[in-house]
Amino acid sequence: MSKASTFSAPKGVPDYVPPQSSEFVAVRDGLTRAARLAGYGHIELPIFEDTGLFARGVGESTDVVSKEMYTFADRGDRSVTLRPEGTAGVMRAVIEHGLDRGQLPVKLSYAGPFFRYERPQAGRYRQLQQVGVEAIGVDDPALDAEVIAIADAGFRGLGLDGFRLEITSLGDDTCRPQYRERLQEFLFALPLDEETRRRAEINPLRVLDDKRKEVREMTADAPLMLDHLSDTAKAHFDEVLAHLDALSVPYVVNPRMVRGLDYYTKTTFEFVHDGLGAQSGIGGGGRYDGLMAQLGGQPLSGIGFGLGVDRTVLALAAEGKTAGSTARCEVFGVPLGEEAKAKLVVIAQQLRAQGIRVDLAYGNRGVKGAMKAADRSGAALALVLGDRDIADGTVGIKNLATGDQESVSSADVVARVGAILGA
């Protein structure tokens, strides 16, 4: 009989299994905490959407739409796409559910997987995990600064400090057309290949985002948007920077920065960490004042970001840090017999009701095997219960770090464990 074939995860799609998954959850939750504190409500988005949403919203000239989307026909022969980013889906939901007709700004946050067909490398996956926020309906530099400060606080709250914020302005409808003409004039004078020239015709900023060395060298002297801002766009950008200064959020103005999505206007930013090498981005975002109208809604402004959970985990590792505990439990029960097991099951549930993570040695491991399992669990304490303890009405509490053990009354064990752990 032939051996059954085995399966593995698709290329570029990571599994997060214990104990590493504990850090993943801690990073994801840490990045969302600052948004909750600022009044951002949670939104849960579909994993797939109508392909046209991303083609229109993200931009057909982007690598995301032209090269990286997972697009397929469903059984009704409708073209659908696994979501490559979150903003377009949020805007669609805001329009569909009329959230834009209530109190403004609409503040929403989300977390989950997104999908792009990229060349897999460290922290750059085909299923990427992101945390994002969107603030829709108010064109206010103070709101731009708040969104940026939320991301900064999320990273710092995890203990990350080796990152920097790069920021620029991509202008507004007043100055962008003139800048576009000047940039195209510069680009069309270069010996560009046919595909790059096509990009320059659709959205010339995309050429400045080209990662190829020869293209970057040719465009080194390209005109910069920051030198062509309208008075209104410049005043907006200056005010954003003033708010960031007041919030003590450090930044570096990068006039050559171009984000990978076409909908950005005015304030645009990226968080980078040099410990990650060439793929240094850990998150970014910006303002997208024309996107809602482009998707059929009101002409309302918006600003948001997407932060990479996978890449933040790697950035912490580059600094020799971890987020949260990788221990799967705080207390491990070691029953010496079936009667002891029945009693520890009850005690475990009582401790869990107090918010304490508890596991037990199930099966017939024997005391040696059970204690070995306790050590491997990462727990701080072991509850040891045998026939003599049952007769005495006590439970043994063992400190797994020091080996010290004490006996307490069965009636007091929950309170005593809570006191030791500070729960």
Swiss-Prot record:
Name listed for the protein in its UniProt record: Histidine--tRNA ligase
Native source species: Rhodococcus jostii (strain RHA1)
Gene3D superfamilies per record: Anticodon-binding domain (3.40.50.800), Bira Bifunctional Protein, Domain 2 (3.30.930.10)
Pfam families in the record: HGTP_anticodon, tRNA-synt_His
Main location: cytoplasm
Taxonomic placement: Bacteria, Bacillati, Actinomycetota, Actinomycetes, Mycobacteriales
Gene: hisS
GO cellular component: cytoplasm
Keyword Aminoacyl-tRNA synthetase: yes
Domain of life: Bacteria
NCBIfam families tied to this protein: hisS
